[in-house]
């Protein structure tokens, strides 16, 4: 694709499938391992009815890491909505109240709060030896490590590698390819909302339990490569006021907000094109409170992203118009949703930052464990893949440490 820096992942589905299975069991993903799907709320019922009128076939309440029944010492979803604000019931999987407490209970995990990593340290042989971090009082501390795993998301992870530059690694750690920070992706996104004559109350029930997957395919006849999904979405009033039509004023906008109770909504998520010019760099003129250069984030849509979004707007509006919408509201993409790329996985060292294990090409005891290792974004929400890669990487590190290779 012209203008894109597409690259094949150095792993296959066969490599990852066993770890997807482990992740689905760990997270309690619905519609896997005998776990039923979540019930559909009114927002989903409107969405599903319109989808079926358009002939869509792959329509259901999604594969969610939210309990539809009591599972894994967590209660079932109580359908109280506003899932973006956190889950008061603990039905939605979160490492904060599942894996971290369990890890601490083993005695083998220590979580240090209020710790901000300044840089990763290395020795004269180029092996990482630990990290320096600022504690809650601003004092600089040091933690030695046999292996360092970086999981700061696609903005903070490259920033950390770049801020760890030394005379041995003048362009930052693991950056011999010049690819650290490059190929930032955030998914092609947008939303479509619609008003109806009767109340929908989209905020009730699980916020995003609804999906149309028919468009998640490669079909260039639509005017773009790759694919996208449509997912139910119900925003709270403050969020809706900010994002329905940013900067809007006047009666057209306020009348739309007046119809909030009668609104249905969906989110668009699709594969955006990696571009080297979409990147994270350091801003040496602006420092954080610890005196470290902050990240600059550069992003511009690829023409393929724009074509895909326009197609999704058209289809989203058609879904609602098929079931009697009185108004539809295509909304602009959110500033960032799923931060991906910037330390991408590659078979060849010159093409990326890490290998198929998330192990940096340049430093064998330095790993990247988050979404920044994604080579491409795909049309899916990324959490399950991030967790699957992390489990696979952990197995690899344990194996390599056991045989003293690390």
Regions found by a protein language model. Name each.
Residues 2-117, 335, 342-344:
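Conserved redox-cofactor binding core of oxidoreductases
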Residues 9-13, 177-295, 303-306, 339, ...:
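FAD cofactor-binding and catalytic pocket of flavoenzymes
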Residues 11-22, 311-318, 392:
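A non-catalytic, amphipathic alpha-helix used as a structural packing/dimerization or gating element
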Residues 40-43, 92, 96, 308-312, ...:
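Hydrophobic (often cysteine-bearing) scaffold residues that line and stabilize catalytic clefts
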Residues 60-62, 76-83, 118-121, 261-272, ...:
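A glycine-rich dinucleotide-binding beta-alpha-beta segment and adjacent secondary-structure elements
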Residues 99-105, 137-142, 345, 351-361:
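A short acidic-Thr-Gly-centered motif at the start of a beta-strand
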Residues 106, 115, 119-123, 131-204, ...:
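Glycine-rich loop(s) and the adjacent beta-strand/alpha-helix scaffold that form part
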Residues 376-397:
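A conserved FAD-binding loop/helix module that cradles the flavin
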């Amino acid at each position: 694709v012209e203008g894109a820096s597409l690259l094949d992942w150095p792993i296959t589905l066969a490599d990852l499938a066993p770890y997807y299975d482990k992740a689905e069991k760990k997270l309690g993903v619905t519609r896997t391992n005998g776990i039923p799907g979540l019930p559909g709320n009114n927002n989903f019922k409107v969405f599903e009815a319109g989808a079926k009128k358009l002939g869509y076939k792959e329509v259901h309440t999604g594969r969610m890491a939210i309990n539809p029944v009591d599972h894994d010492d967590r209660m079932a979803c109580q359908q109280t909505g506003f899932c973006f604000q956190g889950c008061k019931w603990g039905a939605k999987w979160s490492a904060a109240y599942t894996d971290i407490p369990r890890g601490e209970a083993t005695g083998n995990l220590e979580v240090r709060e209020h710790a901000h990593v300044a840089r990763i340290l290395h020795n004269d042989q180029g092996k990482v030896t630990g990290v320096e971090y600022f504690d809650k009082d601003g004092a600089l501390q040091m933690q030695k490590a046999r292996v360092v795993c970086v999981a700061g998301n696609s903005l903070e992870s490259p920033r950390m590698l770049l801020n760890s530059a030394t005379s041995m690694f003048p362009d930052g750690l693991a950056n011999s390819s010049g690819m650290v920070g490059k190929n930032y992706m955030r998914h092609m996104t947008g939303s479509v909302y619609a008003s109806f004559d009767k109340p929908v109350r989209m905020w009730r029930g699980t916020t995003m339990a609804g999906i149309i997957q028919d468009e998640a395919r490669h079909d260039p006849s639509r005017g773009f490569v790759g694919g996208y999904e449509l997912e139910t979405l119900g925003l709270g009033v403050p969020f809706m006021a900010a994002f329905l039509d940013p900067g809007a004023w006047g009666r057209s906008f306020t009348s739309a907000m007046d119809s909030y109770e009668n609104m249905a909504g969906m989110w668009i998520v699709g594969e955006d094109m990696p571009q080297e010019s979409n990147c994270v760099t350091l801003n040496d003129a602006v420092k954080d409170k610890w005196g470290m250069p902050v990240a600059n984030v550069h992003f511009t849509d690829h023409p393929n992203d724009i074509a895909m979004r326009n197609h999704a707007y058209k289809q989203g509006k058609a879904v609602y118009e098929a079931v009697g919408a009185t108004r539809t509201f295509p909304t602009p993409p959110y500033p960032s949703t799923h931060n991906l790329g910037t330390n991408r996985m590659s078979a060849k060292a010159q093409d990326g930052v890490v290998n198929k294990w998330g192990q940096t090409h340049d430093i064998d005891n330095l790993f990247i464990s988050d979404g920044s290792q994604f080579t491409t974004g795909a049309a899916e929400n990324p959490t399950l893949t991030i967790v699957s890669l992390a489990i696979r990487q952990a197995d690899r590190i344990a194996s390599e440490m056991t045989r003293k290779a690390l």
